[in-house]
Regions:
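Short, flexible segments with low predicted structural confidence
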Residues: 41, 48-49, 103-104, 111, ...
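Short, solvent-exposed positions on alpha-helices
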Residues: 126-134
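Alpha-solenoid helical-repeat scaffolds
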Residues: 80-116, 149
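A short, Lys/Arg-enriched amphipathic alpha-helix from helix-turn-helix/homeodomain DNA-binding modules
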Residues: 106-121, 133-167
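Secondary-structure boundary elements
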Residues: 77-80, 125-126, 140-142
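Generic alpha-helical structural element
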Residues: 66-70, 102-105, 121, 128-129, ...
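Charged, low-complexity, helix-prone segments enriched in Lys/Glu/Asp/Gln
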Residues: 6, 56, 98, 160-161
Length: 167
């Protein structure tokens, strides 16, 4: 649970580390590098390289956001990929080229995302780690099939968002 009006994010930038943020509750406005802004509501997911959010600011219009944040080093995963994902034909270089470009991809709430993330919140605490490992694999399979251009939320330039905030 992130509880604040705004936070700044500073970390190492890498075009091969996939950053994922699932917003379960609340709202997030995220100003990223290159002047791109993403807005997430309950059930939305953003996927981008850590280079996009290395120096960024997250705003919480409702004063909070609850969700799950994941960082996946794709070359490390590729070298240590679970056999079941290899057998499924999971193509990590394609995931990297699709989601680790210069701009983030925001996917709106949908039954598939709800099905992936909901069990993480309802599982008994002693099973959460196992569920998390399974659900990350399921999320990677989902991302390998999703076509961002058909599902993506609208992105805004940070100048547009500043103008909206002034109004």
């Amino acid at each position: 649970l992130l509880s604040a009006a705004e936070i700044t994010v500073h970390h190492a930038a890498s075009s091969s580390v996939l950053e994922l943020f699932y917003c379960r509750n609340g709202r997030v406005g995220w100003n990223m590098r290159g002047g791109t802004a993403v807005y997430l509501g309950a059930g939305d997911l953003t996927a981008h390289s850590s280079a996009c959010c290395a120096d960024s600011a997250m705003m919480f219009p409702l004063g909070y956001a609850e969700g799950i944040s994941l960082s996946i080093d794709l070359p490390v995963l590729d070298a240590n990929c679970p056999e079941i994902l290899k057998e499924s034909g999971l193509d990590l270089p394609t995931i990297q080229s699709t989601f680790c470009g210069e701009k983030p991809v925001a996917i709106p709430a949908c039954p598939e995302l709800e099905g992936i993330f909901a069990p993480l919140y309802s599982a008994p605490s002693f099973r959460r780690r196992a569920y998390l490992q399974l659900k990350i694999q399921e999320l990677l399979l989902y991302l390998s099939d999703v076509e961002p251009e058909k599902h993506a939320l609208t992105q805004y330039g940070s100048q547009q968002t500043e103008l909206i905030k002034e109004i």
